[in-house]
Amino acid sequence: ARKDGVRRVHAGFDHYTTTLLAAPYGGQTVGQVLAADAHAPKRLTLTGHSLGGAVAVLAAARLADQGASQLQVVTFGAPAVGNDAFNEAYGRRIRLDRIVMEGDPVEKAVQAVSRTYEQFPDKTVWQAAPTTRRFAHDIAGYADAALRRYYDAKTAYETYLGHAVPDDGGRPFGSPVWVPPLSLTLDEAL
């Protein structure tokens, strides 16, 4: 990996981000709308899974270059997008919550091909449910883990407040719970 201090980003992820930010939206571009919403006192949170997470990081970096300071990025199973110089330049300017499922290979996929790219150093590692048979990168696994964490925290908070919390007895379901794949239909104008 080159250590010359020049910021480098993955060309494919950068092209995708450029295309997204240049897309028309309400008489402006998506980038202009996001930039207008990203200035203090507002906080702008960008999030994504896999490629969407890579784009969220690069979009936040571009918005930071335009003066936005209230940026938060939450990625789920995102690949590395830049080199060490990129990470040093933006690591303090955007609040990044990098979430990775234990065993998710996408986190290190880009580094396996090129040593130019590095992940931001901090990350939160989630464990899949013990009964899951999903591929570690599957978005449904991330959604399941997020919901489990939410309800665990909610239950702890309700208990702390002294509220009655229904006890499920810790019994496993008679059959596994199936989460259907997420899908959406986009308007053809998009």
Model-derived features: where do they sit?
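Catalytic nucleophile loop
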Residues: 52-53
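Serine hydrolase/lipase
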Residues: 2-47, 57, 61-190
